[in-house]
């Protein structure tokens, strides 16, 4: 695993997803204000963990880098397809994790209480995140014919 490349992929992918989340309302999807949401959730835990919106955005960036590291260590060479397709598949995994862990933790409930527009916006964002992580980090998986001894 190339940690520097994974961290860079995480930063670029998180910035890409954040940019998309900011414009989603212009295409009819609900606003997903991740920085404010994480900030509110941290403040609800205790006054010690209270952070402003900038702290929420920083936490989102850190989580984005951590997930990119997980992708690099465990998923990049195990998923099928091109680096972009592997990233898209990983984006679906991250979306499911977000809906099972982060959405309930931030008060949105499991799978955003079935709000289809919110789910669509979240899935779109995570597909962008995963696609960018896969494209920026990923190398091509060697074909079986190129393997030594083939």
Q: For each predicted feature, which ranges?
A:
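Juxtamembrane/disordered regions of integral membrane proteins
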Residues: 1-150
